Regions:
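Short, low-complexity, charge-dense intrinsically disordered segments
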Residues: 1-10, 136
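Conserved catalytic cores of phosphodiester-cleaving nucleases, focusing on short active-site segments
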Residues: 30, 53, 74-92, 103
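Nucleic-acid nuclease catalytic cores
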Residues: 87-136
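Nuclease catalytic cores
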Residues: 11-20, 31-35, 39, 43
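Acidic pyrophosphate-coordinating catalytic loop
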Residues: 63-67, 122-123
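A cross-kingdom feature that marks ATP-driven nucleic-acid transaction machinery
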Residues: 43, 51-54, 94-99
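A short acidic/basic microdomain associated with nuclease active sites
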Residues: 47-64
Length: 136
């Protein structure tokens, strides 16, 4: 049980570090830039904080034993455990949540952050999503 608690604490700390990096980027740059600018700065913040990540990670579709590359890309995957989809749009829609949930299912990543930088306070543009644990 103690080992499980340690894993949960480590994961929570990592999530807080990631959200802190997002807040720092938004605080420094504010709204109004392209998504690509926020992504580059966010990745730099992750490096500064010592987190491993993959940028523009391909997401394949498994169909009848074949992995098909349809051009889907996840903006950032942090330490294989947190998927981050960045936006710089007027407002988040249900479609954007559906997009990240689909990426999470295809990537087998249980936690996602949907982030819209085009807001005055990042808390308004930050949405945490999670999938239930897989059962065998």
């Amino acid at each position: 049980m103690e080992q499980k608690d340690q894993k949960i604490r480590k994961y929570q700390d990592r999530s807080e570090t990631v959200i802190g990096a997002l807040i720092e980027v938004h605080r420094a740059l504010g709204p109004g830039l392209l998504e690509s600018a926020y992504e580059a700065c966010f990745c730099h913040e992750l490096r500064l904080r010592g987190l491993a990540f993959e940028r523009q990670r391909p997401v394949g579709i498994l169909y009848k034993g074949l992995i098909i590359d349809c051009g889907y890309r996840v903006d950032v995957v942090i330490e294989g455990q947190i998927l981050v989809e960045l936006k710089a749009i007027e407002r988040l829609l249900a479609l954007h949540a559906a997009q990240i949930l689909t990426y999470m299912k295809l990537s087998v990543v249980r936690t996602g952050l949907l982030v819209n930088f085009n807001v005055t306070s990042l808390r308004q543009g930050l949405r945490r999503l999670s999938l239930p644990p897989q059962t065998s």
